[in-house]
């Protein structure tokens, strides 16, 4: 028995060493090793998988907001500490400017921020996968594979932006603060606000979730879900915003999302295929909401998690007059509901069937997301990933 355990441990170490060596020499070939290591819940595989996705993010072209990030990066690196803080006074999302300034002073290129955003996002997602699959003893190997697809999607492009990175940090913090009762979760929730200020309501939601006033019956929760799905616009979000004790400059910044250029609902400009993609996302969202409702009735979850979701849904309903913020909050809700469902997933036929449906539509959404960024992929340098070693990729820069 002991001899077989020693041999198994030795084989695992050899497999790990081989995977790391291949990653250094030719990272794309190490993907099968990384995937197998992830399914076996090996930390080294999480790290290499996150770095590999970070490479893809680094080689992606600086389009849209990423171009502005690159321009700001090149500006910040030329500033001394005193002038940099003058620029910081005009910002409300402090993390990216500070990170850009530090990396710029160290001689890094703008691509380094994209690498860190994507790599850190995937490592946090893989850590959630690790803890979720370990905590739920009822999970089969197939369910673990489903969990990997749902929690660690290949849609890397959303993590290139502050919003996507902040969303991952936020969900990570909510998980540890509410589900695991760890104080480090509150740190990540606050950190997410410094990455993107629009997630500030979650600080209040996390604190309010400890109060019993938000204990709702399953019927009240069902009514909230009905409002969430069918209410399209409301002035409650604007009224709530004006009642909060924020500085005037911050209120002006936030109101840009309500009455400024950020408030426009772009759905009317979508093509037929983009609308189809949106509806597929909504299907995933509705199914996960129904899944959570079933768990809500069965009562397997701690009350503080239920209270958190109840308050969260109320805030989303009130934000319906702010299309871009409303959409972002719905994204966070979808991820959290999936995470919550996986934590309490059982092997009943109904739950497994719903899980398979969510996985199928999630895969379709992933394919749609690649179709949507096909134009940018043509101008990316992802081909470098197939011809270079890790050392060469680390030194690679579109500006070099």
Report residues per predicted region.
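Transmembrane-helix signature of polytopic, membrane-embedded enzymes
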Residues: 40, 129-151
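Membrane-interfacial loop-to-transmembrane alpha-helix junctions, especially the N-terminal start
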Residues: 41-47, 299-311, 353-360
């Amino acid at each position: 028995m002991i001899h077989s355990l020693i041999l198994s441990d030795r084989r695992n170490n050899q497999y790990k060493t081989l995977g790391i060596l291949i990653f250094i020499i030719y990272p794309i070939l190490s993907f099968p090793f990384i995937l197998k290591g992830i399914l076996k819940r090996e930390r080294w595989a999480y790290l290499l998988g996150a770095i590999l996705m970070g490479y893809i993010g680094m080689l992606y072209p600086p389009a849209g907001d990423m171009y502005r990030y690159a321009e700001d990066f090149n500006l910040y690196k030329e500033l001394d500490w005193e002038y940099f803080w003058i620029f910081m006074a005009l910002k409300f999302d402090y993390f990216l400017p500070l990170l850009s300034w530090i990396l710029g002073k160290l001689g890094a290129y703008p691509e380094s921020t994209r690498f860190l955003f994507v790599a850190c996002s995937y490592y946090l997602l893989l850590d959630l996968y690790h803890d979720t699959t370990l905590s739920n003893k009822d999970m089969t190997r197939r369910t673990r594979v489903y969990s990997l697809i749902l929690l660690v999607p290949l849609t890397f492009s959303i993590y290139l932006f502050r919003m996507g990175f902040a969303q991952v940090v936020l969900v990570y913090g909510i998980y540890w603060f509410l589900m695991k009762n760890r104080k480090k979760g509150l740190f990540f929730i606050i950190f997410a606000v410094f990455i993107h200020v629009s997630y500030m309501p979650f600080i209040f939601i996390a604190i309010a979730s400890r109060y019993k006033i938000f204990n709702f019956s399953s019927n009240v929760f069902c009514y909230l879900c009905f409002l969430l799905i069918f209410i399209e616009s409301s002035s409650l979000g604007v009224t709530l915003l004006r009642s909060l004790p924020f500085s005037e400059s911050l209120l002006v910044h936030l109101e840009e999302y309500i009455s400024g250029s950020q408030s426009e609902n772009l759905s009317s400009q979508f093509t037929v295929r983009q609308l189809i993609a949106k509806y597929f996302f909504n299907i995933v969202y509705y199914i996960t909401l129904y899944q959570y409702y079933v768990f809500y009735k069965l009562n397997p979850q701690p009350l503080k998690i239920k209270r958190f979701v109840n308050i969260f849904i109320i805030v989303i309903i009130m934000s319906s007059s702010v299309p871009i913020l409303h959409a972002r909050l719905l994204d966070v809700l979808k991820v959290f509901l999936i995470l919550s469902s996986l934590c309490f997933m059982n092997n009943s036929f109904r739950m497994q069937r719903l899980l398979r449906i969510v996985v199928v539509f999630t895969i379709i959404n992933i394919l749609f997301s690649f179709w949507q960024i096909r134009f940018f992929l043509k101008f990316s340098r992802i081909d470098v990933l197939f011809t270079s070693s890790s050392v060469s990729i680390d030194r690679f820069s579109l500006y070099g």
